[in-house]
């Protein structure tokens, strides 16, 4: 039962999303599938082949973001993850202005939210447990000129591995910026996860993960931003909260080619 729990959790989340949508709580939603091939990864094997499913939606109570990354290690394997791994985050945010029918905007802040996230790493190796992290804190929607969106969340991290103490703080900005180019556009989007302090055996870390993609849609008769291709850069200092040393390198500089289809 424990082995099936992560998949049951994800299935329940997706089914619940569409059930609520039928009740007209949903304002809009977007789903996408991305395929990536990259090199330069640390801690895990150097080469990653990745399929990513993403869901973003806006509701009468707030918003929701979900992604599922499935990795293959090009024939190699890790001690804990085997030949592949799955990592997912489910991040609902609850809008205080929507829930209280109060305008909380000020300056560049459009809305104030209660931000939460449930992070799960699924191990493909006997004898290793799946790992969970729970995050909660204040979130903000920002109105910054030129950006399609810009969010800023502050999280208190609560690990659920039985060994790591709570007490680490994480700052997470997410953004998207579109620039017209060659009768189409270039999309610059991404996020930063910055765990600002150490706790127990866990180091601080800094994860910068932007994508630059060219929108192919207008050239194929598709709606804007349906199909895009480009490059993802992945800089991760002290990856997995493991401090980089001369004997075990955890500072990562990886680059991947990406093709993304949105539906």
What is each residue range found by the language model?
Residues 53, 90, 136-138, 173-175, ...:
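Membrane-embedded beta-strands of outer-membrane beta-barrel proteins
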Residues 67-127, 205:
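Surface-exposed loop and membrane-interface regions of Gram-negative outer-membrane beta-barrel proteins
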């Amino acid at each position: 039962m424990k082995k099936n729990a992560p998949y049951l959790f994800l299935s329940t989340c997706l089914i619940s999303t569409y059930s609520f949508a039928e009740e007209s709580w949903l304002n809009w939603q977007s789903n996408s599938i991305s395929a990536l091939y990259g090199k330069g990864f640390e801690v895990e094997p150097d080469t990653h082949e990745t399929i990513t499913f993403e869901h973003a939606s806006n509701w009468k109570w707030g918003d929701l973001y979900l992604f599922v990354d499935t990795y293959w290690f090009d024939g190699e394997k890790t001690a804990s993850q085997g030949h592949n791994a799955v990592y997912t985050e489910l991040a609902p945010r609850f809008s205080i202005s929507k829930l209280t029918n109060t305008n909380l905007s000020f300056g560049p802040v459009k809305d104030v939210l209660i931000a939460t996230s449930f992070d799960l790493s699924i191990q493909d190796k006997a004898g290793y447990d799946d790992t969970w992290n729970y995050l909660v804190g204040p979130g903000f929607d920002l109105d910054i000129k030129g950006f399609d969106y810009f969010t800023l969340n502050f999280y208190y991290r609560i690990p659920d591995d039985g060994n790591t103490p709570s007490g680490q703080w994480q700052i997470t900005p997410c953004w998207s910026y579109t620039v017209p180019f060659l009768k189409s556009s270039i999309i610059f989007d991404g996020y930063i996860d910055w765990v600002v302090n150490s706790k127990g055996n866990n180091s601080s870390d800094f994860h910068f993960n932007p994508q630059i993609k060219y929108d192919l849609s207008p050239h194929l008769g598709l709606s804007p931003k349906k199909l895009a291709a480009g490059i993802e850069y992945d800089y991760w200092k002290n990856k997995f909260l493991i401090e980089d040393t001369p004997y075990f390198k955890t500072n990562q500089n990886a680059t991947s080619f990406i093709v993304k289809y949105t539906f």
